[in-house]
């Protein structure tokens, strides 16, 4: 628990202190966000707000994770693990794709960055590298950072994926989560606040897995997760970085995270879900993100097949703005929904453990 608290503290400090420096730098360089002309009228006043604040979020995550391990040398903490590095590497790789996208938008002063093909290739490449590596690096107990079996709270033994199918599965998971968070990042503080809650839930889940790991505490209900404590540090550092960034990103936002932040944060959820064996449970924890990307898919499919739109605008947080909800009302209500789904997800996780031990 001490390591988790250190990770949060370092990440909050780095993010909250670095963000205003980025605001000054990007404002001086003229790196202002471009607004869609067909978006809600209230958003036009945000034109010129600095973007690429995801740099501060990623810096906070890196500092929180590695800073905690450096501090751990003083009290014999566990070292850096393959699981932690793979999740961090996935997030950083996707953040790099987002950074290129943001830079093109800012340099060309338009709301369109990388074309769809280039962006998709970047996401797929990141996912494939992650998928190939995450089944390697087995520890002395024979556990790899991930399992080829589909997982809810633990592996579902009846659903085992071949190596090729596992790679395709990871491409789907990584692409879905990175795009889902990207679509959600359309209102001040919405994505950062929701991410803080989802990763906070993952801190609880992975911390519990660490205390009930089959390697150290074999018995009913134990978990075959390779490095649960290190995953808890990644989750804690992410939550802390999002909280620090939210100080400046809350309405009215002084800076946006941009694709640099949203794609990276989607990678965090994807990586944590795969390495903690909770791919299906993650859908409950991040249900708001799932709803956002689903609204986009429904809007596109419905319009192409019927010529009509389900929502006034997608992602559907803009729909609620266009029907008269204030932006802050949408944000707070979506935060509340995320808190509820995170609570439900943690309850399902704990309930499964109780059932496993026969309680």
Curated annotation (Swiss-Prot):
Subcellular location: Cell membrane
Bilayer-crossing regions: 3-23, 55-75, 80-100, 117-137, 156-176, 187-207, 231-251, 255-275, 280-300, 334-354
Keyword Ubl conjugation recorded: no
Molecular function, one GO term: metal ion binding
Biological process, per Gene Ontology: cell division; cell wall organization; peptidoglycan biosynthetic process; regulation of cell shape
Cofactors named for this entry: Mg(2+)
Reactions it catalyzes: UDP-N-acetyl-alpha-D-muramoyl-L-alanyl-gamma-D-glutamyl-meso-2,6-diaminopimeloyl-D-alanyl-D-alanine + di-trans,octa-cis-undecaprenyl phosphate = di-trans,octa-cis-undecaprenyl diphospho-N-acetyl-alpha-D-muramoyl-L-alanyl-D-glutamyl-meso-2,6-diaminopimeloyl-D-alanyl-D-alanine + UMP
EC numbers for this chain: 2.7.8.13
Pathway(s) this gene product operates in, as recorded in its UniProt entry: Cell wall biogenesis; peptidoglycan biosynthesis
GO cellular component: plasma membrane
Database matches in InterPro entries: Glycosyl_transferase_4 (IPR000715), PNAcMuramoyl-5peptid_Trfase (IPR003524), PNAcMuramoyl-5peptid_Trfase_CS (IPR018480)
Signal sequence, start to end: none
Matching PROSITE patterns: MRAY_1, MRAY_2
Origin superkingdom: Bacteria
Function: Catalyzes the initial step of the lipid cycle reactions in the biosynthesis of the cell wall peptidoglycan: transfers peptidoglycan precursor phospho-MurNAc-pentapeptide from UDP-MurNAc-pentapeptide onto the lipid carrier undecaprenyl phosphate, yielding undecaprenyl-pyrophosphoryl-MurNAc-pentapeptide, known as lipid I.
Similarity remark: Belongs to the glycosyltransferase 4 family. MraY subfamily.
Protein name: Phospho-N-acetylmuramoyl-pentapeptide-transferase
Gene (name only): mraY
């Amino acid at each position: 628990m001490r390591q988790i608290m250190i990770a949060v503290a370092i990440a909050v400090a780095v993010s909250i202190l670095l963000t205003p420096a980025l605001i000054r730098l990007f404002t001086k360089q003229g790196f202002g966000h471009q607004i869609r002309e067909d978006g809600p009228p209230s958003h036009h006043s945000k034109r010129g707000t600095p973007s690429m604040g995801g740099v501060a979020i990623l810096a906070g995550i890196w500092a929180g994770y590695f800073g905690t391990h450096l501090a751990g040398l003083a009290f014999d903490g566990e070292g850096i693990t393959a699981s932690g590095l793979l999740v961090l590497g996935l997030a950083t790789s996707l953040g790099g794709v987002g950074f290129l996208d943001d830079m093109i938008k800012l340099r060309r002063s338009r709301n369109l960055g990388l074309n769809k093909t280039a962006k998709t290739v970047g996401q797929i490449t990141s996912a494939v590298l992650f998928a190939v590596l995450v089944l390697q690096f087995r520890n002395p107990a024979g556990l790899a950072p991930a399992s080829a079996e589909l997982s809810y709270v633990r592996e579902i033994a009846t659903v085992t994926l071949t190596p090729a199918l596992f790679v395709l599965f990871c491409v789907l998971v990584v692409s879905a989560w990175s795009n889902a968070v990207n679509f959600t990042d359309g209102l001040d503080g919405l994505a950062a606040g929701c991410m803080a809650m989802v990763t906070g839930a993952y801190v609880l889940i992975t911390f519990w897995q660490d205390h009930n790991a089959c390697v150290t505490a074999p018995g009913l209900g134990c978990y075959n997760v390779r490095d649960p404590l290190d995953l808890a540090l990644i989750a804690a550092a992410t939550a802390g970085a999002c909280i620090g960034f939210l100080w400046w990103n809350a309405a009215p936002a002084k800076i946006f995270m941009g694709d640099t932040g949203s794609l990276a944060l989607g990678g965090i959820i994807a990586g944590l879900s795969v390495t903690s064996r909770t791919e299906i449970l993650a859908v409950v924890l991040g249900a708001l993100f799932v709803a956002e990307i689903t609204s986009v898919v429904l809007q596109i499919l419905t319009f192409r097949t019927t010529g009509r739109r389900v929502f006034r605008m997608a992602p559907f947080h803009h729909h609620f703005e266009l029907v008269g909800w204030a932006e802050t009302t949408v944000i707070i209500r979506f935060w509340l929904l995320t808190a509820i789904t995170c609570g439900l997800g943690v309850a399902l996780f704990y309930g499964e453990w109780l059932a496993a031990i026969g309680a």
